[in-house]
Amino acid sequence: MLRHQSNYQILDLVGQGQFGRVFAAVELKSGALVALKELKTKQLSTSSFLRELTFLVTLDHFNLVTCKALEHGYNQRYIVMDYCEGGTLRSFLNNSPAISLNQSLKLVIDILSGLKYAHEKGIIHRDIKPENILLKTSDRSYTAHIADFGIAKLKQEIDSQNILGNTGSPAYMAPEQFYGEYSYNCDLYGVGIILYELVTGNRPFSGMPKELVAAHLSQPVTISADVPLLLRLAISKSLEKLPSRRYQTAAEML
């Protein structure tokens, strides 16, 4: 709950992030729509809260959900963020009967553009999936914006320590992530899964977590011949089992 003296009024619950609920709200002074990400003190450590806040305030790119302010409530803290009226890419995939190839490619280009910027800042997102991609509407089309940097890590931190704990979502994780190994192309592997899902309507692998682990580690990716050849090649390269055989940078995949 917000304080009585708050600068914002909550309108509705619009989503659930990894570390808290997300509300649509209005800034009382300007009337602008914003998103408030609730971070409950008892559910989120100060270090985790400060980590995401630090990443958000230092990142400034059109295809990243950025931080506008910090708001305090009763036993809660809120990050004030860009409002993305199109919802999540997951909802879009679930509710859209068909997504054009052009729209699919545009969304992936948006995601890669945001990752290129984040990677240049030394940040690996580590949890690229449709639930963490928010959409804005623009000229009868959609633009994609990467959200939820809650488990992101600086490359220099990953190089200097063994990363355990929250590591991502099994359906979108690169094989080496299951062993606690990360690089920039782990994020690109997740983009490859999203691209596959956009153009085929399904993920390349499905099942329970243990089945997903086995599939990512050893099962070949099959792509319908209906998918254009150049796109099949791009998907195949992004989903190689060995990191060295994948795209090494977002710029290369672009």
Predicted feature residues:
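Protein kinase glycine-rich loop
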Residues: L11-G17, V22
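AlphaC helix of the eukaryotic protein kinase fold
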Residues: K40-T58
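Activation-segment/catalytic-loop signature of the eukaryotic protein kinase fold
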Residues: L70
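Conserved short submotifs of the Hanks-type protein kinase catalytic core
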Residues: Y74-T88, F92
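Activation segment signature within eukaryotic-like protein kinase domains
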Residues: L107-V108
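Protein kinase catalytic-loop region centered on the HRD/HxD motif
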Residues: S113-I123
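C-terminal lobe helix-coil module of Hanks-type protein kinase domains
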Residues: A171-L254
